[in-house]
Amino acid sequence: GRVLDLDNEWLIITDRKGVAKVNKQTLKEEKYYLQPGMSIVGAITISSQKQVWTANARHHATDIYILDRDLNLLRTLNGSKDTYIESIVEDASHHMWVTTSKGLLCYDAKTWEELLLPTDFMEATQNKKIHFVLPYWQNFLLIGISGEGMYRYDVARRVLTRFHVQQQLKGDRYVCFIDTNNGIWLSDQENDFHYYPEKAAFNNLSSIFERLEDPFVKNLLFDYEGYLWMRSSH
């Protein structure tokens, strides 16, 4: 499941029952939100408005539930029945980006209205497998498109450009994380691991796994002290 930080007192956790609000001190569940088919949803985030945006199902999710901080349903955003939701993130301009099986959708985090995207952006991302969408330096997004590579999208200017062109993302799946120095940590979850600093061209940190028999990276996380935590297959 997922663990999200709501505020100083509360966590939002997904488990087999649905979405739970949990007290950090007592670890007691104050409230659940559950709809048929939800289970352990993967596409979920907490917006800048302290609202929970979550997919309506674990598999083949088509709709988004917007919940308040007490997990009361505020609104349902209905999607197409043949378009499946994969992830939800918010950028610095308070736009919610929804990755789907057929491309990207964008919503206003405050009004919940869908926003129109530039034609060239839609052509570049529509009907393609998108590995990740992450808030990046200042008001940018980092977008990873399968078989093509990484793109940087200027949200204010609405301009999409290729980024680190050596990387074409030809693998089946990727783990990507952006640190506080705007460095990009990228793994294909098999045997390759790359670090892209903000200003340098390219570095390969695969040697970090020399002591591991099977360097299968599942997750990357930087904690508040700046340490990198990796969850591997061992």
Predicted regions and their residues:
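Carboxylate-rich, polar loop motifs that coordinate divalent cations or form catalytic acidic clusters
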Residues: 1-234
